[in-house]
Amino acid sequence: MRKTSSVNYRNEVELLSNCPLAAAPKLIGGRWRIMLLWYVHHGIVRFSDLQKTIPPITEKMLHQQLREMERDILVLRVVQGRTVSYALTELGESLVPMLAGLAEWSERHRVGERLWTALTPLDQPDATADRLEVRGQV
């Protein structure tokens, strides 16, 4: 349980109350949520298909993320017999244009490549020159 008397808590409440740009990442942020929203937006998706599509995510984490997204009214859990599937809610669907724009921006500016390069250890000879070039520190 978080201390509601802390300065950090009060600052967060103030920021989330007054800045829409601060609130949105709290709802869709994290390592997996945007990716899950993107895969689910194509239609009703089975849990097992999500597991296969995103191999690095553990079953436990996938369950947790989907439950939280269901709680936040971003996805709808559909149970048919033993099959569990997920679909976007109206709120989740309203995020799709923003996600598409974000994906386009990321591709245009090669953001994934820049982040990957930044994460590459400097002791790898092949990566050193590229890393310095991307950062503009040649």
Feature-to-residue mapping (PLM):
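N-terminal helix-turn-helix DNA-binding core of bacterial DNA-binding proteins
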Residues: 12-61, 80-93, 116
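C-terminal flanking helix
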Residues: 53, 68-70
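Residues within the DNA-recognition helix of helix-turn-helix
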Residues: 65
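Amphipathic alpha-helical dimerization/coiled-coil segments
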Residues: 2-8, 16, 38, 94-138
